[in-house]
Regions:
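Conserved, structured core segments of small domains
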Residues: 1-92
Length: 92
């Protein structure tokens, strides 16, 4: 199943710079492994925001929930998920 996911990150000032850097490093490794596996085929930054739009290609809701809740930045994220379906006018 395909999902459009919007993620906004808000790391509170109570998190030290060192801890934030560590979390971001873990996040990068985690997300790149998912990209290499094909489960996270598209990732775009939102200009001027600490946010992204992503496409996930996973088995279903439970798989996506497991992936998203495993993100090291998950505790600091607001996430919106939209399931996608093929459009009848699409030529692909």
């Amino acid at each position: 199943m395909l999902y459009l996911v919007h993620m906004e990150v808000n790391i509170p000032s109570s998190v030290s710079e060192q801890e934030a850097a560590k979390i971001k490093s873990l996040e990068k490794e985690y997300s790149q492994n998912l990209q290499k596996s094909g489960k996270w085929p598209h990732l775009w930054r939102v200009v001027g925001e600490y946010a992204n739009y992503s496409i996930f290609d996973v088995e279903g809701n439970d798989d996506l929930h497991t992936i998203l809740s495993g993100l090291p930045l998950f505790p600091y994220m607001k996430i919106q998920v939209t399931p996608l379906a093929k459009h009848p006018s699409s030529i692909k």
